[in-house]
Amino acid sequence: VLTEEDKARVRVAWVPVSKNAELYGAETLTRLFAAHPTTKTYFPHFDLSPGSNDLKVHGKKVIDALTEAVNNLDDVAGALSKLSDLHAQKLRVDPDNFQFLGLCLEVTIAAHSGGPLKPEVLLSVDKFLGQISKVLASRYR
């Protein structure tokens, strides 16, 4: 459960992410596909090379969806309800991949932070992304 302090930290940490959604999204997907190559199977029609337009467009969609969750931290499940249904019922994405994506996003955020992330910021962002993973995986029952 995110505390009020966690929510405040996530909102502050998210400002550069949301302002640079295409960049953060594409870099996160590039890291995901490099570290977890089996995730590529969900994108057979994409150009998965780093910096490709496909990664930029889809990466922006990912960050925009997460920004919606940041804007609704008191109802993340509601904010991601349609996305959760899509990934569970239509796309049938392995729910473990949501955790992998979250970890890759943490690395991307850290890489752009200009220095080490403060432990309390990393903890809050990690809790938020863990909550996202749980919400997205919740429709798999």
Swiss-Prot record:
Family: Belongs to the globin family.
GO terms for biological process, alphabetical: hydrogen peroxide catabolic process
Biological classification of the source: Eukaryota, Metazoa, Chordata, Craniata, Vertebrata
Superkingdom of source: Eukaryota
Record domain Globin: where: 1-141
Keywords of this entry: Heme, Iron, Metal-binding, Oxygen transport, Transport
One cellular-component annotation, GO: haptoglobin-hemoglobin complex
Name of the protein described by the UniProt record: Hemoglobin subunit alpha
Binding-site residues, O2: H58
